[in-house]
Amino acid sequence: LPERFDHDQRPAHATERASGITSNRRQTMQNRRSALSRVLTTAACAALVLATGSALAADHYPSKPIRLVVPYPAGGGTDIIARLMGTQLSQRWGQPVIVDNKPGASGMMGNDLVAKAPADGYTVLLGITALVQIPALYKKVPYQLSDLAPVSQAAKSADLVFVPRSSGITSLQQFVAKAKAQPGKLNYGSYGNATSSHLHGEQLKLKAGIDMVHVPYQGSGPEMAAMLGGQLESAFIDAAAAYPHIKSDKVSILAVTGSQRHPALPDVPTMAEAGYSGFEANGWFGYFVPASTPQPIVDKLGNELAAIVRMPEISKRLLDMGLIPVGSTPAEFKPLLARDAAHWKSIVDAAKISMD
């Protein structure tokens, strides 16, 4: 067996060799620490430069016109909100805000345009709930939700459950009982395939165990006209579009979707209050920018848009449209998107709805 030495019993040449090895190791460790220190210092400097650059960019933002993309036709609710708030933003910042309507493919064309735009805060999207519903409904979407950064939720909306006044039905429970007694005989209208109203109708069918025929329309206007004309036995209609007709003697409103009663209809119960939970998700209108837009610019834009929503005259205009003003920060808006995406996907999957 090799002889074992204590440190003070080693031959001189062994001690010298060990000392040299220790010295080399110490020098190597010092070199590594020095290299690591240089890397960390460089990274810190780069981060500081980046943060400083972003802050300076925000200080000078906006320095040119802002393009506000609306992925739906002119004249609709989204377009009206864009022009209403865009005018105020232009006045407050002294830069033109140009509303650019880019309809097509259920909003995907406009959404994709902004997702792929330069991330400098000068191309902004006013999207709606469909933005988080589309990935669950279509297999091929040209962008990811992660390609867009939330800026501010301007307002939220709800669908109202209508029936003809002549039906004599005064509660959702009565309507469900009638639908169960006549499976497949009653219909419900929506303002389009794969819209929130369509998904709400399918959700009620699943929750209540009823069978109804879906009748889609090209928008809330034609759907409301069909309801008033007695062509539908029931309908989920957007509160903003239905607002001028909520006092009509031709229709009854049984319930409202969303987490709370509508301010204009304090006596109408929510779906949960009417006996059917799971309809708490509201529709919404919200602003987005490309995902890599510097956070100081996102925050500056979000704060300004939220301040505009809080202006009394703007809040009143939104309420008069049947909407509920919100004016959220980017941090408040982001978790809502994740919750809504999961919520709508669960309904689409359960109802086996596909637009492909």
Can you annotate each of these PLM segments?
Residues 7, 24-26, 63-65, 206-207, ...:
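An extracytoplasmic/periplasmic, membrane-proximal ligand-sensing/linker region
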Residues 57-147, 185-187, 209-234, 245, ...:
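N-terminal (or domain-start) structured segment
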Residues 130-139, 205-207, 234-268:
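A ligand-binding cleft/hinge motif common to bilobed small-molecule-binding domains
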Residues 1-63, 355-356:
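Short, low-complexity disordered leader/linker segments with a strong preference
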Residues 126-131, 190, 219-220, 237-242, ...:
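Beta->alpha turn/N-cap motifs
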Residues 116-122, 136-222, 271, 284-317:
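Hinge/capping helix and adjacent helix->loop/strand transition within the periplasmic-binding protein
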